[in-house]
Design a protein with these regions (language model features):
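ATP-dependent adenylation/nucleotidyltransferase module used to activate substrates
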Residues: 1-161, 172, 181, 188, ...
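AMP-forming adenylation/ATP pyrophosphatase catalytic core
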Residues: 122-128, 134-377
Length: 377
């Protein structure tokens, strides 16, 4: 059923091993390099150029055809444009989740299927599905389930939590059952040691080697305003723009006996409210308001309409038990009650929901609920 597989080749070790394993399995493998960003930073550096050269090197070595797919315009509209608008509104977005939803598992998936004749696509993500790493357990009558990768540290289901079930049904994750260390050893064993040695890219792809503060300042107008102590109402410093700061971040304010941390941003007044101390109780809440959920496999609720599941809003943080309750008739708005309070719940980020090893999907965070101190009062 699945003969031709188009691999998203990035120039890194994960997609290199993915392509090699698919070829060893006898698939008709085609490579596709996604060009999503084409600007060079002020130092003249563009990591995408080297990645493209490495992708060509891999496909020559494996003797598979390679095509460059250009999604630069779409990326600007669907990902980067939304990214800037969110920062201008005072919220903190997650461009990696948006890229997977709109580009890799939407436009790229459709391109591979319609233009390259793919029966399925494959990527080097650390994730799994119930259909198996090579879709060997595919069942057109069964629902697709997104499962965590076996490498707890590298698991990428958090970033895949907004993709469509239709695309996921025809996606292979060959390295999802491997750890990063195993992938690198495998690469070295099969003659792909150059890719195993390549430094792993970290952070937001379009920022490159620049500091995020310098980068974002190129696109959003600097508008200075006040840092205000939320407890006292006093101005304690000046900021250079709301977009430079996110909830929970340490505020750089000189001359203070105790460090301040960002609590809230008032866009209309261009004010950042801060609180004293990283463990200030106002930064902690056990309630979260979310909207517009995307369900990969919509879970069943309990008889009282409550879903018991696991929650995280940062992919490196431990999962927390929670109760999920719909707060609108159409299910577009929900309320999350956490079993234990968390610090710095950030508007614009995503609440991702799990049960055991399955990732159900996610919803965008609108705002945190009141702090535990307020509720206790």
């Amino acid at each position: 059923m699945f003969k031709r597989v188009v691999v998203g080749v990035s120039g890194g070790v994960d997609s290199a091993v993915t392509a090699y394993m698919l070829k060893q399995k006898g698939f008709d493998v085609r490579g596709a390099f996604m060009k999503n960003w084409d600007l060079i930073d002020e130092s003249g550096y563009c990591s995408g150029e080297q990645d493209w050269l490495d992708a060509q090197k891999l496909c020559r070595q494996l003797r598979i055809p390679l095509e460059e797919t250009n999604f630069v315009k779409d990326y600007w509209l669907e990902v980067f444009g939304s990214f800037l608008k969110d920062y201008e509104k005072g919220v903190t977005p997650n461009p990696d989740i948006l890229c997977n939803r709109h580009i890799k598992f939407n436009l790229f998936y459709k391109y591979a299927r319609e233009k390259m004749g793919a029966d399925a696509i494959a990527t080097g993500h650390y994730a799994r599905t119930n259909f198996g790493p090579f879709l060997e357990q595919y069942d057109d009558r069964a629902p697709i389930r997104l499962l965590a990768g076996v490498d707890d540290i590298k698991d990428q289901t958090f970033f895949l939590s907004q993709i469509s079930a239709d695309a996921l049904r025809r996606t292979m994750f060959p390295i999802g059952a491997m750890t990063k260390a195993q992938v690198k050893r495998y690469a070295a064993d099969v003659g792909l040691e150059a890719f195993a040695r390549k430094k792993e890219s970290m952070g937001i792809c379009f920022v490159g080697k620049r500091s995020f503060q310098d980068f974002i300042g190129e696109y959003i107008e600097t508008k200075p305003g006040d840092f205000v102590d939320f407890d006292t109402g006093k101005v304690v410093g000046m900021h250079k723009g709301l977009h430079h700061w996110t909830v929970g971040q340490k505020a750089k304010i000189g001359g203070c006996l105790q460090p301040y941390f960002v609590f809230q941003k008032d866009v209309d007044r261009n004010v950042i409210f801060v609180v004293s101390g990283t463990d200030h109780p106002l930064l902690v809440t056990d309630m979260v308001y979310v909207e517009n959920p995307v369900w990969i496999n919509k879970p069943e609720r309990l008889s009282d309409g409550v879903l018991r599941c696991l929650f995280r809003f940062q992919h490196t943080k431990p999962l927390v038990h929670c109760s999920l309750i719909e707060s609108s008739e159409d299910g577009s708005r929900m309320f999350v009650k956490l079993d234990e309070p968390l610090r710095a719940i950030t508007p614009g980020q995503y609440a991702v929901f799990y049960k055991d090893e399955e990732c159900f999907g996610s919803a965008r965070i609108v705002k945190p609920g009141p702090s535990i101190v307020y509720c206790q009062r």
